[in-house]
Structure formats: C-alpha cells, structure tokens
Amino acid sequence: MTYENSTVNRWHENPDSRLRNGGDTIDAHQPRVATLCHSLAAHMGHPLIGSDLLLAARNHDEAERVLGDMPAPAKARFPELAEAYAIAEREVLRGMGLDWKLTAKEEQMLHLCDKLDAHMFAVSRGVTGQERDEARALINVMSDKFKAREWVAAQMGANQ
C-alpha cells in the first residue's frame, strides 16, 4: 500500500473543463466508492465478512499510479487496447500486494458504485447534457439488477 498523496487526476481527458479541472483524484475517488459499496451491501443484505469487495473498492484504481488513467472513451473505441491495459492493471496490482477475488455479483456492485460516484461527481460540478443522461440511464439499468433504484436515489439525494 502506498501512503503518498495521489497525483493521478481523474477526468484529465474530459472535454468539460468542470470535470477536467475539478480536482478529483484517485485518493478522493476510491474511498467514496468503498463507502458506496459498503452502503449498497448493507442495503442488499450482502455479507462483507469473507468478502474482498471493500478491499477492491478502496484500491481498484491503484494501478493508475504506475500506468496512468486510460480514459473511458479510449477503452470503448479500442477494446483490444483496453484488454491489454486491464491485464497490465492486474499485474501492477498484484505487484502492490493487491490481489482480490470478487464474485460476479460483487464485480457488478463495484462497477455500479464506481459509475455512481463518477455521476455524482459530475452532478456536483454542474455537468448537464447527453453524457450525464447516458450515465444516469446506465446507473438505472445496473441498479435495477440489484433492486436498488431507491438506494441509488437516496445516495444521489444525499449528494445534492
């Protein structure tokens, strides 16, 4: 585990200056995701004892300290590059002693909370428009898998 402050900025390639210059780092983002995962697990009655969910949530972007952050649009446009990056991320994380095992359900929970945090950060910066609406639609689809739409709404309401 590293203890220095992160210089890994999130949103660094985003065309919206409110996000690009918003000051969000992985050191701020990862604890928020862990908090959301903890809350979602409690809402769902999902046991955390024996689970690596919070470890993964708290450290899921640590490889970016070594590799940098690959923007989501680049991952979407070049899936083969995204897969190579994912392999490199896993290798770097293992080298840091961060090797967790998640169930498929926990992977989905982590993904939902990661996207939800990004959406809430964008909302907090006043971002509107199609990209925000698309993110909200994705979050709704994901939250429906867990019957957690009310939970998502409560999290977003607490963030307003």
Task: Locate predicted features.
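Active-site flanking loop/helix segments enriched in acidic
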Residues: 2-29
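Alpha-helical phosphate/pyrophosphate-handling elements in metalloenzyme active cores
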Residues: 19-53
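Histidine- and acidic-residue-rich, metal-dependent catalytic cores
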Residues: 37, 86-100
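Alpha-helical scaffolds flanking conserved acidic
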Residues: 46-59, 104-112
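Short active-site segment of divalent metal-dependent hydrolases/proteases
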Residues: 59, 63-64, 117
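Active-site-flanking alpha-helical
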Residues: 63, 67-68, 121
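Post-HEXXH active-site segment of zinc metalloproteases
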Residues: 70-87
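Divalent metal-dependent phosphate-bond-processing catalytic cores, especially two-metal-ion Mg2+/Mn2+ enzymes
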Residues: 102-160
